[in-house]
Amino acid sequence: GKEELRSQYRSRGAGENCFGVSPANLNKLKKKIGVDPVLALALWNFKNTDGQILAAMIADPQEMTEPQLNAWVRDIDYYLVGEAFVSNVVSKNVFTKALMLEWIASKEEYVKQCGYLAMASLAQQDPTIPDGEFTDQLYAIAHELQNAPSRAREATRSAWA
């Protein structure tokens, strides 16, 4: 990684365990590795920001169980990890809808963020879901937007769009 990018990530909330690997280099690694659930789990468990983002990129979303997804979401402590997790794993998993509702109800900032990102993903990717199905969540967004943690608040903007 690069020190400049590492400093940038850390100033935005990434913890000390961050190398500062660029998204372009992570994408190159993803292409080189392909899907590798065993490596993804090892990288995720290392608790390194860059490793968790890459883990989300190389995980097999269809193989992940609901308990595994719940375990991973509770490990998230940086918004870019949450975004990578939802876009690469959660949005392509059969449990997306059920987890979305559970995570939106969470008090944990990054869990809630992932819930709203999952909702935005479902709304954009699945035209068979009637708009009315998101009504309760949209009312919740309107009600709690002012008091929601910052990353959850940002994710609600994606869900609202």
Where are the model-predicted features located?
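Alpha-helical scaffold domains
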Residues: G1-A161
